[in-house]
Protein backbone atom coordinates (compact mmCIF):
# COMPACT_ATOMS: atom_id res chain seq x y z
CA UNK A 1 0.00 0.00 0.00
CA UNK A 2 1.25 3.47 -0.88
CA UNK A 3 0.76 6.78 0.87
CA UNK A 4 -0.04 5.15 4.20
CA UNK A 5 -0.58 7.45 7.16
CA UNK A 6 -2.27 7.40 10.54
CA UNK A 7 -4.60 10.29 11.30
CA UNK A 8 -6.49 11.26 14.44
CA UNK A 9 -10.26 11.45 14.50
CA UNK A 10 -11.91 14.83 14.93
CA UNK A 11 -12.78 15.12 18.66
CA UNK A 12 -16.53 15.07 17.88
CA UNK A 13 -16.15 11.70 16.12
CA UNK A 14 -14.45 10.24 19.20
CA UNK A 15 -17.30 11.50 21.39
CA UNK A 16 -19.95 10.17 19.02
CA UNK A 17 -18.34 6.73 18.79
CA UNK A 18 -18.13 6.44 22.57
CA UNK A 19 -21.71 7.56 23.14
CA UNK A 20 -23.08 5.47 20.31
CA UNK A 21 -21.46 2.19 21.29
CA UNK A 22 -22.84 2.56 24.82
CA UNK A 23 -26.29 3.97 24.17
CA UNK A 24 -27.36 2.22 20.95
CA UNK A 25 -26.28 -1.29 21.88
CA UNK A 26 -29.84 -2.35 22.79
CA UNK A 27 -30.86 -1.53 19.22
CA UNK A 28 -27.65 -2.69 17.60
CA UNK A 29 -29.14 -4.31 14.48
CA UNK A 30 -29.74 -0.83 13.03
CA UNK A 31 -26.11 -0.80 11.88
CA UNK A 32 -27.22 -2.90 8.89
CA UNK A 33 -30.00 -0.46 8.04
CA UNK A 34 -27.58 2.47 8.21
CA UNK A 35 -24.90 0.82 6.05
CA UNK A 36 -27.44 -0.37 3.43
CA UNK A 37 -28.98 3.11 3.48
CA UNK A 38 -25.55 4.60 2.71
CA UNK A 39 -25.11 2.13 -0.15
CA UNK A 40 -28.53 3.13 -1.50
CA UNK A 41 -27.51 6.81 -1.37
CA UNK A 42 -24.25 5.97 -3.19
CA UNK A 43 -26.24 4.23 -5.94
CA UNK A 44 -28.64 7.19 -6.24
CA UNK A 45 -25.73 9.60 -6.60
CA UNK A 46 -24.10 7.48 -9.30
CA UNK A 47 -27.35 7.25 -11.30
CA UNK A 48 -27.72 11.03 -11.13
CA UNK A 49 -24.10 11.77 -12.13
CA UNK A 50 -24.32 9.21 -14.95
CA UNK A 51 -27.20 11.11 -16.54
CA UNK A 52 -24.65 13.60 -17.85
CA UNK A 53 -21.67 11.18 -17.89
CA UNK A 54 -22.75 7.56 -18.70
CA UNK A 55 -19.10 6.43 -18.66
CA UNK A 56 -19.23 6.50 -14.86
CA UNK A 57 -21.11 3.18 -15.02
CA UNK A 58 -17.90 1.61 -16.40
CA UNK A 59 -20.03 -0.87 -18.36
CA UNK A 60 -21.91 -2.03 -15.24
CA UNK A 61 -25.24 -0.23 -14.78
CA UNK A 62 -26.80 -2.93 -12.57
CA UNK A 63 -26.46 -1.31 -9.16
CA UNK A 64 -26.73 -3.36 -5.97
CA UNK A 65 -25.28 -3.97 -2.51
CA UNK A 66 -23.98 -7.40 -1.51
CA UNK A 67 -23.57 -9.07 1.87
CA UNK A 68 -21.20 -11.91 2.65
CA UNK A 69 -19.79 -13.33 5.85
CA UNK A 70 -16.88 -15.52 6.93
CA UNK A 71 -17.52 -17.51 10.10
CA UNK A 72 -13.86 -18.45 10.56
CA UNK A 73 -12.53 -14.89 10.26
CA UNK A 74 -15.67 -13.56 12.01
CA UNK A 75 -16.17 -10.86 9.39
CA UNK A 76 -19.26 -9.42 7.74
CA UNK A 77 -18.74 -7.56 4.44
CA UNK A 78 -21.04 -5.17 2.58
CA UNK A 79 -19.96 -4.11 -0.91
CA UNK A 80 -21.75 -1.74 -3.30
CA UNK A 81 -21.01 -0.58 -6.83
CA UNK A 82 -22.21 2.97 -6.27
CA UNK A 83 -20.41 6.29 -6.59
CA UNK A 84 -17.41 5.39 -4.38
CA UNK A 85 -15.02 7.88 -2.72
CA UNK A 86 -11.72 9.63 -3.36
CA UNK A 87 -9.04 9.87 -0.66
CA UNK A 88 -10.16 13.39 0.30
CA UNK A 89 -13.78 12.27 0.48
CA UNK A 90 -12.83 9.36 2.74
CA UNK A 91 -11.07 11.76 5.13
CA UNK A 92 -14.03 14.15 5.07
CA UNK A 93 -16.73 11.49 5.40
CA UNK A 94 -15.10 8.99 7.74
CA UNK A 95 -12.80 11.17 9.84
CA UNK A 96 -14.90 14.23 10.57
CA UNK A 97 -18.49 15.31 11.11
CA UNK A 98 -19.27 18.38 9.04
CA UNK A 99 -22.40 19.43 10.93
CA UNK A 100 -22.36 22.80 12.65
CA UNK A 101 -23.40 22.68 16.28
CA UNK A 102 -22.17 19.08 16.65
CA UNK A 103 -19.88 19.77 19.59
CA UNK A 104 -22.56 21.53 21.62
CA UNK A 105 -25.06 18.79 20.77
CA UNK A 106 -22.78 15.98 21.91
CA UNK A 107 -21.89 17.83 25.10
CA UNK A 108 -25.59 18.24 25.90
CA UNK A 109 -26.16 14.49 25.97
CA UNK A 110 -26.11 13.09 29.47
CA UNK A 111 -26.13 9.60 30.91
CA UNK A 112 -29.79 8.66 30.34
CA UNK A 113 -29.29 5.83 27.85
CA UNK A 114 -32.88 5.65 26.55
CA UNK A 115 -32.87 9.39 25.91
CA UNK A 116 -29.34 9.28 24.48
CA UNK A 117 -30.24 6.61 21.94
CA UNK A 118 -33.12 8.73 20.68
CA UNK A 119 -30.96 11.83 20.42
CA UNK A 120 -28.07 10.06 18.74
CA UNK A 121 -30.45 8.30 16.39
CA UNK A 122 -31.89 11.70 15.55
CA UNK A 123 -28.38 12.97 14.87
CA UNK A 124 -27.88 10.34 12.17
CA UNK A 125 -25.05 7.92 12.97
CA UNK A 126 -24.61 6.42 9.49
CA UNK A 127 -21.28 4.70 8.92
CA UNK A 128 -20.14 4.93 12.55
CA UNK A 129 -22.93 2.54 13.62
CA UNK A 130 -20.66 -0.27 12.37
CA UNK A 131 -18.65 0.09 15.59
CA UNK A 132 -21.63 -0.99 17.70
CA UNK A 133 -20.95 -4.61 16.67
CA UNK A 134 -17.37 -4.41 15.29
CA UNK A 135 -14.08 -3.80 17.09
CA UNK A 136 -12.39 -3.04 13.77
CA UNK A 137 -13.76 -1.76 10.46
CA UNK A 138 -11.94 -1.91 7.12
CA UNK A 139 -13.06 0.12 4.10
CA UNK A 140 -11.86 -0.27 0.51
CA UNK A 141 -13.29 2.21 -1.99
CA UNK A 142 -12.76 3.77 -5.42
CA UNK A 143 -14.63 6.67 -7.00
CA UNK A 144 -16.61 5.95 -10.17
CA UNK A 145 -14.73 6.99 -13.31
CA UNK A 146 -11.35 7.16 -11.53
CA UNK A 147 -8.36 4.91 -12.42
CA UNK A 148 -8.06 1.56 -10.60
CA UNK A 149 -4.89 2.70 -8.79
CA UNK A 150 -6.74 5.58 -7.06
CA UNK A 151 -8.49 3.21 -4.65
CA UNK A 152 -8.41 4.05 -0.95
CA UNK A 153 -7.91 1.82 2.10
CA UNK A 154 -9.25 2.98 5.50
CA UNK A 155 -9.15 1.08 8.77
CA UNK A 156 -9.90 1.87 12.40
CA UNK A 157 -10.63 0.22 15.72
CA UNK A 158 -13.01 3.07 16.54
CA UNK A 159 -10.79 4.64 19.15
CA UNK A 160 -8.54 7.65 18.64
CA UNK A 161 -7.26 7.27 15.09
CA UNK A 162 -7.51 5.56 11.71
CA UNK A 163 -5.12 4.38 8.99
CA UNK A 164 -5.52 5.51 5.40
CA UNK A 165 -3.58 4.41 2.30
CA UNK A 166 -3.70 4.24 -1.51
CA UNK A 167 -4.56 0.87 -3.10
CA UNK A 168 -5.54 -0.58 -6.44
CA UNK A 169 -9.21 -1.48 -6.67
CA UNK A 170 -10.57 -2.73 -9.97
CA UNK A 171 -14.27 -2.32 -9.19
CA UNK A 172 -15.76 1.08 -8.39
CA UNK A 173 -17.79 1.52 -5.20
CA UNK A 174 -17.25 0.81 -1.52
CA UNK A 175 -16.57 -2.39 0.41
CA UNK A 176 -16.93 -2.32 4.20
CA UNK A 177 -15.67 -5.24 6.29
CA UNK A 178 -16.75 -5.48 9.92
CA UNK A 179 -14.50 -7.51 12.24
CA UNK A 180 -17.17 -8.52 14.73
CA UNK A 181 -16.80 -8.20 18.49
CA UNK A 182 -17.01 -11.27 20.72
CA UNK A 183 -20.65 -12.22 21.21
CA UNK A 184 -21.89 -10.83 17.88
CA UNK A 185 -21.98 -14.17 16.04
CA UNK A 186 -25.67 -13.71 15.19
CA UNK A 187 -24.52 -11.51 12.29
CA UNK A 188 -22.65 -14.49 10.83
CA UNK A 189 -25.95 -16.28 10.33
CA UNK A 190 -27.74 -16.29 6.96
CA UNK A 191 -31.26 -16.41 8.42
CA UNK A 192 -30.58 -13.61 10.91
CA UNK A 193 -29.20 -11.30 8.20
CA UNK A 194 -32.20 -11.99 5.94
CA UNK A 195 -34.54 -11.21 8.84
CA UNK A 196 -32.91 -7.83 9.63
CA UNK A 197 -32.80 -6.80 5.97
CA UNK A 198 -36.44 -7.77 5.48
CA UNK A 199 -37.33 -5.63 8.51
CA UNK A 200 -35.35 -2.51 7.60
CA UNK A 201 -34.49 -2.53 3.90
CA UNK A 202 -37.31 -4.25 2.01
CA UNK A 203 -38.64 -0.91 0.76
CA UNK A 204 -35.52 0.57 -0.84
CA UNK A 205 -35.10 0.47 -4.61
CA UNK A 206 -31.53 -0.88 -4.50
CA UNK A 207 -31.34 -4.70 -4.70
CA UNK A 208 -29.77 -6.22 -1.58
CA UNK A 209 -28.10 -9.55 -2.36
CA UNK A 210 -26.70 -12.17 -0.01
CA UNK A 211 -23.96 -14.66 -0.82
CA UNK A 212 -25.13 -18.25 -1.22
CA UNK A 213 -22.50 -21.02 -1.24
CA UNK A 214 -23.20 -24.39 -2.80
CA UNK A 215 -22.14 -26.91 -0.15
CA UNK A 216 -21.29 -29.57 -2.75
CA UNK A 217 -19.08 -27.76 -5.24
CA UNK A 218 -18.28 -24.54 -3.31
CA UNK A 219 -19.64 -22.26 -6.05
CA UNK A 220 -20.93 -18.85 -4.99
CA UNK A 221 -24.12 -17.18 -6.23
CA UNK A 222 -25.95 -14.03 -5.13
CA UNK A 223 -29.61 -14.05 -4.11
CA UNK A 224 -31.75 -10.90 -3.99
CA UNK A 225 -33.47 -10.74 -0.59
CA UNK A 226 -35.47 -7.48 -0.71
CA UNK A 227 -38.33 -6.36 -2.94
CA UNK A 228 -36.06 -3.70 -4.50
CA UNK A 229 -38.98 -1.60 -5.67
CA UNK A 230 -39.23 2.05 -4.64
CA UNK A 231 -41.95 2.07 -1.97
CA UNK A 232 -43.68 5.21 -3.23
CA UNK A 233 -44.24 3.67 -6.68
CA UNK A 234 -46.40 0.91 -5.18
CA UNK A 235 -50.14 1.25 -4.58
CA UNK A 236 -51.18 2.42 -1.12
CA UNK A 237 -53.27 -0.73 -0.61
CA UNK A 238 -50.12 -2.87 -1.04
CA UNK A 239 -48.10 -1.05 1.63
CA UNK A 240 -48.42 -1.86 5.32
CA UNK A 241 -48.06 0.70 8.12
CA UNK A 242 -44.86 -1.05 9.19
CA UNK A 243 -43.40 -0.58 5.69
CA UNK A 244 -44.31 3.12 5.72
CA UNK A 245 -42.64 3.48 9.13
CA UNK A 246 -39.52 1.59 8.02
CA UNK A 247 -39.22 3.79 4.93
CA UNK A 248 -39.47 6.92 7.09
CA UNK A 249 -36.61 5.68 9.25
CA UNK A 250 -34.58 5.02 6.10
CA UNK A 251 -34.98 8.51 4.61
CA UNK A 252 -34.98 10.46 7.88
CA UNK A 253 -32.32 8.39 9.69
CA UNK A 254 -34.66 8.54 12.68
CA UNK A 255 -35.18 5.82 15.27
CA UNK A 256 -38.74 6.76 16.20
CA UNK A 257 -41.94 6.13 14.25
CA UNK A 258 -43.47 9.14 12.48
CA UNK A 259 -46.62 10.74 13.88
CA UNK A 260 -48.39 10.74 10.53
CA UNK A 261 -47.86 10.38 6.80
CA UNK A 262 -49.59 11.02 3.48
CA UNK A 263 -48.91 9.12 0.24
CA UNK A 264 -50.47 10.56 -2.91
CA UNK A 265 -50.23 10.10 -6.65
CA UNK A 266 -51.49 13.09 -8.65
CA UNK A 267 -52.32 13.01 -12.35
CA UNK A 268 -53.61 15.79 -14.58
CA UNK A 269 -51.90 19.09 -15.41
CA UNK A 270 -48.97 17.94 -13.34
CA UNK A 271 -48.00 14.37 -12.58
CA UNK A 272 -46.18 13.56 -9.39
CA UNK A 273 -46.10 11.25 -6.40
CA UNK A 274 -45.47 12.55 -2.90
CA UNK A 275 -44.82 10.73 0.35
CA UNK A 276 -44.75 13.17 3.26
CA UNK A 277 -44.08 12.46 6.93
CA UNK A 278 -44.64 14.40 10.14
CA UNK A 279 -41.88 13.29 12.58
CA UNK A 280 -42.61 12.55 16.23
CA UNK A 281 -39.73 14.70 17.46
CA UNK A 282 -37.83 17.76 16.29
CA UNK A 283 -34.31 17.23 14.92
CA UNK A 284 -31.60 18.31 17.34
CA UNK A 285 -30.49 21.17 15.09
CA UNK A 286 -33.90 22.43 13.93
CA UNK A 287 -33.25 25.94 15.26
CA UNK A 288 -29.69 26.05 13.93
CA UNK A 289 -29.33 28.62 11.15
CA UNK A 290 -27.48 26.05 9.02
CA UNK A 291 -30.10 23.33 9.56
CA UNK A 292 -30.59 21.39 6.33
CA UNK A 293 -34.17 20.59 5.46
CA UNK A 294 -36.39 19.84 2.50
CA UNK A 295 -37.64 16.83 0.57
CA UNK A 296 -35.79 14.22 -1.44
CA UNK A 297 -36.37 15.01 -5.11
CA UNK A 298 -36.79 12.31 -7.75
CA UNK A 299 -37.62 12.93 -11.40
CA UNK A 300 -39.21 9.93 -13.12
CA UNK A 301 -37.94 7.73 -10.26
CA UNK A 302 -34.34 8.95 -10.72
CA UNK A 303 -32.84 10.49 -7.57
CA UNK A 304 -31.87 14.13 -8.19
CA UNK A 305 -31.08 15.71 -4.82
CA UNK A 306 -31.50 15.63 -1.06
CA UNK A 307 -32.90 18.54 0.93
CA UNK A 308 -34.75 20.24 -1.93
CA UNK A 309 -36.12 23.02 0.26
CA UNK A 310 -37.93 24.74 -2.62
CA UNK A 311 -40.95 22.42 -2.26
CA UNK A 312 -41.87 23.34 1.30
CA UNK A 313 -42.19 26.73 3.06
CA UNK A 314 -39.75 27.38 5.88
CA UNK A 315 -42.40 27.14 8.61
CA UNK A 316 -42.97 23.48 7.53
CA UNK A 317 -39.23 22.68 7.52
CA UNK A 318 -39.82 19.75 9.89
CA UNK A 319 -41.64 17.75 7.16
CA UNK A 320 -39.65 14.80 5.81
CA UNK A 321 -40.31 12.75 2.71
CA UNK A 322 -39.97 12.87 -1.04
CA UNK A 323 -41.50 14.06 -4.27
CA UNK A 324 -41.19 12.20 -7.56
CA UNK A 325 -42.11 14.50 -10.47
CA UNK A 326 -42.76 13.55 -14.09
CA UNK A 327 -42.68 17.18 -15.26
CA UNK A 328 -39.28 18.49 -14.14
CA UNK A 329 -36.24 17.92 -16.40
CA UNK A 330 -33.71 15.29 -15.34
CA UNK A 331 -30.92 17.88 -15.44
CA UNK A 332 -32.74 20.17 -12.99
CA UNK A 333 -30.55 22.23 -10.64
CA UNK A 334 -31.33 24.10 -7.43
CA UNK A 335 -31.17 27.36 -9.40
CA UNK A 336 -33.71 26.12 -11.97
CA UNK A 337 -35.97 24.88 -9.16
CA UNK A 338 -35.94 28.33 -7.57
CA UNK A 339 -37.50 30.02 -10.61
CA UNK A 340 -39.64 27.19 -11.97
CA UNK A 341 -43.41 27.60 -12.28
CA UNK A 342 -43.70 23.81 -11.85
CA UNK A 343 -41.84 24.09 -8.52
CA UNK A 344 -44.14 26.87 -7.33
CA UNK A 345 -47.24 24.84 -8.19
CA UNK A 346 -45.82 21.75 -6.47
CA UNK A 347 -44.88 23.79 -3.40
CA UNK A 348 -48.41 25.18 -3.16
CA UNK A 349 -49.99 21.72 -3.51
CA UNK A 350 -47.61 20.05 -1.03
CA UNK A 351 -48.09 22.85 1.52
CA UNK A 352 -51.86 22.37 1.36
CA UNK A 353 -51.36 18.61 1.70
CA UNK A 354 -49.30 19.00 4.89
CA UNK A 355 -51.80 21.45 6.40
CA UNK A 356 -54.60 18.97 5.62
CA UNK A 357 -52.59 16.23 7.37
CA UNK A 358 -52.26 18.44 10.44
CA UNK A 359 -55.96 19.37 10.39
CA UNK A 360 -56.87 15.68 10.25
CA UNK A 361 -54.44 14.84 13.06
CA UNK A 362 -55.86 17.63 15.25
CA UNK A 363 -59.42 16.46 14.57
CA UNK A 364 -58.87 12.70 14.92
CA UNK A 365 -56.26 12.49 17.68
CA UNK A 366 -55.94 15.52 19.97
CA UNK A 367 -53.28 13.80 22.08
CA UNK A 368 -51.05 13.12 19.08
CA UNK A 369 -51.60 16.64 17.80
CA UNK A 370 -50.54 17.99 21.18
CA UNK A 371 -47.35 15.93 20.88
CA UNK A 372 -46.80 17.52 17.45
CA UNK A 373 -47.45 21.01 18.84
CA UNK A 374 -44.92 20.60 21.65
CA UNK A 375 -42.24 19.68 19.11
CA UNK A 376 -43.07 21.95 16.16
CA UNK A 377 -45.54 24.60 17.35
CA UNK A 378 -42.88 27.32 17.38
CA UNK A 379 -42.13 26.66 13.70
CA UNK A 380 -45.82 26.68 12.77
CA UNK A 381 -46.17 30.09 14.45
CA UNK A 382 -43.96 31.49 11.66
CA UNK A 383 -46.72 30.56 9.20
CA UNK A 384 -49.05 33.60 9.38
CA UNK A 385 -46.15 35.90 8.44
CA UNK A 386 -44.72 33.62 5.77
CA UNK A 387 -47.82 32.21 4.09
CA UNK A 388 -50.66 34.71 3.77
CA UNK A 389 -52.65 32.50 1.39
CA UNK A 390 -53.01 29.78 4.05
CA UNK A 391 -53.25 32.09 7.06
CA UNK A 392 -56.79 31.04 8.07
CA UNK A 393 -55.89 27.33 7.93
CA UNK A 394 -52.71 27.89 9.94
CA UNK A 395 -54.66 29.95 12.50
CA UNK A 396 -56.94 26.95 13.14
CA UNK A 397 -53.86 24.82 13.86
CA UNK A 398 -52.36 27.22 16.43
CA UNK A 399 -52.59 26.39 20.13
CA UNK A 400 -52.36 28.76 23.11
CA UNK A 401 -52.30 28.86 26.88
CA UNK A 402 -55.31 30.71 28.26
CA UNK A 403 -56.94 31.96 31.45
CA UNK A 404 -59.62 29.31 30.82
CA UNK A 405 -57.31 26.34 31.42
CA UNK A 406 -55.10 27.75 34.18
CA UNK A 407 -52.17 25.78 32.76
CA UNK A 408 -49.02 26.73 30.86
CA UNK A 409 -49.73 23.95 28.33
CA UNK A 410 -50.66 25.41 24.94
CA UNK A 411 -53.86 23.45 24.27
CA UNK A 412 -56.51 26.07 23.40
CA UNK A 413 -57.42 26.54 19.73
CA UNK A 414 -58.92 29.75 18.35
CA UNK A 415 -62.08 27.78 17.55
CA UNK A 416 -62.25 26.78 21.24
CA UNK A 417 -61.87 30.42 22.27
CA UNK A 418 -64.54 31.73 19.87
CA UNK A 419 -67.00 29.04 21.02
CA UNK A 420 -66.65 30.33 24.61
CA UNK A 421 -66.85 34.06 23.86
CA UNK A 422 -69.17 36.01 26.17
CA UNK A 423 -72.42 37.41 24.82
CA UNK A 424 -71.72 40.71 23.07
CA UNK A 425 -67.93 40.08 23.04
CA UNK A 426 -66.59 41.28 19.69
CA UNK A 427 -62.84 40.70 20.02
CA UNK A 428 -60.37 37.94 20.82
CA UNK A 429 -58.29 39.18 23.75
CA UNK A 430 -54.67 38.23 24.30
CA UNK A 431 -51.58 39.33 26.20
CA UNK A 432 -47.89 38.85 25.35
CA UNK A 433 -45.23 38.56 28.05
CA UNK A 434 -41.76 37.14 28.71
CA UNK A 435 -43.13 34.07 30.49
CA UNK A 436 -46.38 32.28 31.21
CA UNK A 437 -46.16 33.35 34.87
CA UNK A 438 -45.72 37.02 33.88
CA UNK A 439 -48.66 36.84 31.47
CA UNK A 440 -50.91 35.07 33.96
CA UNK A 441 -50.25 37.54 36.78
CA UNK A 442 -50.34 40.71 34.65
CA UNK A 443 -52.51 43.50 36.08
CA UNK A 444 -53.96 43.94 32.58
CA UNK A 445 -56.03 40.80 33.24
CA UNK A 446 -57.82 42.09 36.35
CA UNK A 447 -60.84 43.45 34.49
CA UNK A 448 -61.17 40.29 32.39
CA UNK A 449 -61.08 38.03 35.43
CA UNK A 450 -63.74 40.20 37.05
CA UNK A 451 -65.94 39.97 33.92
CA UNK A 452 -65.22 36.26 33.29
CA UNK A 453 -63.71 36.92 29.86
CA UNK A 454 -61.06 34.52 28.55
CA UNK A 455 -57.64 35.91 27.56
CA UNK A 456 -55.00 34.05 25.54
CA UNK A 457 -51.62 34.04 27.32
CA UNK A 458 -48.73 34.32 24.85
CA UNK A 459 -45.18 33.96 26.13
CA UNK A 460 -43.05 32.55 23.28
CA UNK A 461 -40.55 35.00 21.82
CA UNK A 462 -42.14 34.74 18.38
CA UNK A 463 -45.69 35.50 19.59
CA UNK A 464 -45.64 39.29 19.34
CA UNK A 465 -44.26 39.09 15.81
CA UNK A 466 -46.86 36.47 14.86
CA UNK A 467 -49.73 38.60 16.20
CA UNK A 468 -48.65 41.53 14.04
CA UNK A 469 -49.67 39.36 11.05
CA UNK A 470 -52.60 37.54 12.65
CA UNK A 471 -55.15 40.35 12.79
CA UNK A 472 -58.44 38.43 12.86
CA UNK A 473 -60.02 34.99 13.02
CA UNK A 474 -63.47 34.16 11.65
CA UNK A 475 -64.28 37.86 11.46
CA UNK A 476 -63.22 38.55 15.07
CA UNK A 477 -60.36 41.03 15.52
CA UNK A 478 -57.51 40.29 17.93
CA UNK A 479 -57.04 42.82 20.72
CA UNK A 480 -54.00 43.07 22.99
CA UNK A 481 -55.14 43.83 26.53
CA UNK A 482 -52.00 45.93 27.07
CA UNK A 483 -53.03 48.37 24.33
CA UNK A 484 -55.33 51.34 24.99
CA UNK A 485 -58.65 50.62 23.25
CA UNK A 486 -62.25 51.88 23.34
CA UNK A 487 -63.63 48.36 23.69
CA UNK A 488 -61.71 47.99 26.97
CA UNK A 489 -63.23 51.23 28.25
CA UNK A 490 -66.70 49.88 27.49
CA UNK A 491 -65.89 46.72 29.39
CA UNK A 492 -64.80 48.82 32.36
CA UNK A 493 -68.14 50.72 32.44
CA UNK A 494 -66.36 54.06 32.06
CA UNK A 495 -69.75 55.81 31.58
CA UNK A 496 -70.88 55.08 35.17
CA UNK A 497 -72.03 58.47 36.70
CA UNK A 498 -70.40 57.76 40.10
CA UNK A 499 -67.10 57.00 38.42
CA UNK A 500 -67.31 60.16 36.34
CA UNK A 501 -67.85 62.23 39.49
CA UNK A 502 -64.88 60.60 41.22
CA UNK A 503 -62.74 61.27 38.16
CA UNK A 504 -63.75 64.93 38.11
CA UNK A 505 -62.58 65.32 41.69
CA UNK A 506 -59.18 63.87 40.72
CA UNK A 507 -58.65 66.06 37.64
CA UNK A 508 -56.22 68.41 39.47
CA UNK A 509 -54.23 65.36 40.63
CA UNK A 510 -54.01 64.00 37.05
CA UNK A 511 -52.82 67.41 35.75
CA UNK A 512 -50.22 67.56 38.50
CA UNK A 513 -48.90 64.09 37.50
CA UNK A 514 -48.79 65.16 33.82
CA UNK A 515 -46.77 68.26 34.72
CA UNK A 516 -44.35 66.21 36.81
CA UNK A 517 -43.72 63.48 34.20
CA UNK A 518 -43.82 65.74 31.12
CA UNK A 519 -42.50 64.09 27.94
CA UNK A 520 -41.62 60.84 29.71
CA UNK A 521 -45.13 59.53 29.09
CA UNK A 522 -47.56 59.99 26.22
CA UNK A 523 -50.52 60.69 28.51
CA UNK A 524 -51.81 60.30 32.06
CA UNK A 525 -55.37 59.14 32.62
CA UNK A 526 -57.59 57.40 35.14
CA UNK A 527 -58.81 53.86 34.49
CA UNK A 528 -61.41 51.52 35.94
CA UNK A 529 -59.84 48.44 34.33
CA UNK A 530 -57.95 47.65 37.54
CA UNK A 531 -59.15 46.03 40.74
CA UNK A 532 -56.04 45.22 42.84
CA UNK A 533 -53.32 47.27 41.13
CA UNK A 534 -52.73 51.02 41.59
CA UNK A 535 -51.38 51.74 38.08
CA UNK A 536 -50.45 50.26 34.72
CA UNK A 537 -48.81 51.47 31.54
CA UNK A 538 -50.39 50.84 28.13
CA UNK A 539 -49.51 51.73 24.55
CA UNK A 540 -51.68 53.22 21.83
CA UNK A 541 -52.97 50.84 19.15
CA UNK A 542 -50.52 52.27 16.59
CA UNK A 543 -47.51 52.32 18.96
CA UNK A 544 -44.83 49.63 19.15
CA UNK A 545 -45.54 47.25 22.03
CA UNK A 546 -43.13 46.36 24.83
CA UNK A 547 -42.63 42.81 23.53
CA UNK A 548 -41.94 44.00 19.97
CA UNK A 549 -39.34 46.46 21.29
CA UNK A 550 -37.69 43.55 23.14
CA UNK A 551 -37.64 41.53 19.90
CA UNK A 552 -35.86 44.38 18.13
CA UNK A 553 -33.33 44.67 20.97
CA UNK A 554 -32.69 40.89 20.99
CA UNK A 555 -31.98 41.08 17.25
CA UNK A 556 -29.49 43.91 17.85
CA UNK A 557 -31.70 46.47 16.11
CA UNK A 558 -32.49 49.99 17.27
CA UNK A 559 -36.16 50.13 18.26
CA UNK A 560 -38.06 53.41 18.59
CA UNK A 561 -38.66 54.44 22.20
CA UNK A 562 -41.97 53.11 23.52
CA UNK A 563 -44.15 56.01 24.73
CA UNK A 564 -46.46 54.71 27.42
CA UNK A 565 -49.84 55.93 28.63
CA UNK A 566 -49.78 56.01 32.43
CA UNK A 567 -53.14 54.79 33.76
CA UNK A 568 -54.04 55.22 37.45
CA UNK A 569 -56.71 53.35 39.42
CA UNK A 570 -58.72 56.05 41.30
CA UNK A 571 -60.18 53.45 43.69
CA UNK A 572 -56.82 52.19 44.93
CA UNK A 573 -55.55 53.29 48.35
CA UNK A 574 -52.05 54.19 47.11
CA UNK A 575 -53.44 56.48 44.39
CA UNK A 576 -55.78 58.15 46.91
CA UNK A 577 -52.82 58.58 49.27
CA UNK A 578 -50.68 60.14 46.51
CA UNK A 579 -53.52 62.51 45.57
CA UNK A 580 -53.58 63.88 49.14
CA UNK A 581 -49.84 64.68 49.31
CA UNK A 582 -49.18 68.43 49.16
CA UNK A 583 -45.40 68.44 49.56
CA UNK A 584 -43.90 68.52 46.04
CA UNK A 585 -40.86 66.37 46.88
CA UNK A 586 -42.92 63.67 48.54
CA UNK A 587 -45.54 63.85 45.78
CA UNK A 588 -42.80 63.25 43.18
CA UNK A 589 -41.61 60.21 45.15
CA UNK A 590 -45.15 58.75 45.18
CA UNK A 591 -45.72 59.30 41.46
CA UNK A 592 -42.29 57.94 40.50
CA UNK A 593 -42.91 54.87 42.68
CA UNK A 594 -46.29 54.20 41.04
CA UNK A 595 -44.79 54.64 37.56
CA UNK A 596 -41.85 52.35 38.37
CA UNK A 597 -44.25 49.68 39.66
CA UNK A 598 -46.27 49.89 36.45
CA UNK A 599 -43.13 49.76 34.27
CA UNK A 600 -41.74 46.81 36.23
CA UNK A 601 -45.00 44.88 35.77
CA UNK A 602 -45.00 45.66 32.04
CA UNK A 603 -41.31 45.23 31.13
CA UNK A 604 -39.96 42.96 33.85
CA UNK A 605 -37.00 45.34 34.35
CA UNK A 606 -36.24 48.93 35.34
CA UNK A 607 -33.49 51.20 34.06
CA UNK A 608 -32.48 52.01 37.66
CA UNK A 609 -33.73 49.36 40.12
CA UNK A 610 -31.60 50.78 42.97
CA UNK A 611 -33.38 54.14 42.72
CA UNK A 612 -36.71 52.30 42.89
CA UNK A 613 -35.63 50.48 46.07
CA UNK A 614 -34.34 53.70 47.71
CA UNK A 615 -37.59 55.51 46.88
CA UNK A 616 -39.68 52.69 48.30
CA UNK A 617 -37.61 52.55 51.49
CA UNK A 618 -37.95 56.33 52.00
CA UNK A 619 -41.74 56.18 51.65
CA UNK A 620 -42.02 53.17 53.95
CA UNK A 621 -40.07 54.97 56.70
CA UNK A 622 -41.70 58.39 56.19
UniProtKB/Swiss-Prot annotation:
Residues 1-334 are annotated as: A. Residues 551-622 are annotated as: C. One of its GO terms (cellular component) is cytosol. Residues 335-550 are annotated as: B. Transmembrane segments: none annotated. GO terms for biological process: DNA damage response; protein folding; response to heat. GO terms for molecular function: ATP binding; ATP hydrolysis activity; ATP-dependent protein folding chaperone; unfolded protein binding. It comes from the Bacteria. Keywords: ATP-binding, Chaperone, Cytoplasm, Nucleotide-binding, Stress response. It is found in: Cytoplasm. It holds the Pfam family HSP90. Belongs to the heat shock protein 90 family. Homodimer. Molecular chaperone. Has ATPase activity. This is Chaperone protein HtpG. It comes from Yersinia pestis. The lineage of its organism: Bacteria, Pseudomonadati, Pseudomonadota, Gammaproteobacteria, Enterobacterales.
Amino acid sequence: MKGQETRGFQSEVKQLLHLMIHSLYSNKEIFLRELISNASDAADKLRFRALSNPELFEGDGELRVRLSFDKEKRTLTLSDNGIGMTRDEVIDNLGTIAKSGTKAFLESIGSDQAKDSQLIGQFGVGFYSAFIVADKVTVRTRAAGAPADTGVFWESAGEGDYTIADITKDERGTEITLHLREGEDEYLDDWRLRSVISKYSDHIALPVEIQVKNEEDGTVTWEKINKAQALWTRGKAEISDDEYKAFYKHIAHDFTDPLSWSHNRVEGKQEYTSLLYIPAQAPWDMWNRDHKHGLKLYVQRVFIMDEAEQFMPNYLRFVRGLIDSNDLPLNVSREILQDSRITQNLRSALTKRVLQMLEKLAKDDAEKYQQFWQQFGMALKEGPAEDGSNKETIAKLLRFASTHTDSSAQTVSLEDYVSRMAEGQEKIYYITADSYAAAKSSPHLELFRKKGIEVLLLSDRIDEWMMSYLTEFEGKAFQSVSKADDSLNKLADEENPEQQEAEKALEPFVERVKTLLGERVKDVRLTHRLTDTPAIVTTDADEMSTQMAKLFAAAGQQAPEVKYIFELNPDHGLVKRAAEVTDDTQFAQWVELLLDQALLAERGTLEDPNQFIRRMNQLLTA
